[in-house]
Amino acid sequence: MQYKGFKPYPFQRGIIDDILNKDDMFYTMTCGRQIGKTLLLINMLLYYGINKPKSTLLWVSPFYSMGVKVLSEIIDAIEDSGIVNEANKSEKIITLINGTRIYFRSAEKPETIRGLSIDYAFIDEAQDVSDDAFNKSILPTLTAK
């Protein structure tokens, strides 16, 4: 997997290969600071969004400001690529031309996650997401399908 602008470092390549070659429900990373975890996660989100048509994906950031930043970065990176059908910053949803919908939510307000049925969830900085937010809001969206 290599898209314009993203060339994984060897350790990232190992993580990507591990994720793509397994069918596990959960995959977690424990890594040092400032080594590209969020960038790797963004690229995995886009990989699944592009390669799993009509999927529903969820990006969860522990804090609202982090989620808005990631949403803006992704829109800036892909808006002219031809893969975006609609990017709604106010609703925090990107819809791709293949029917995939990507929701961006914050664990600060887990009630905004409830009610969604998600195929794949991507949780950035998961150590800052409360057990309550994960167990009562995020996990049920994955098991609803």
Where are the regions that the model predicts?
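Phosphate/NTP-binding elements of NTP-utilizing enzymes
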Residues: 1-145
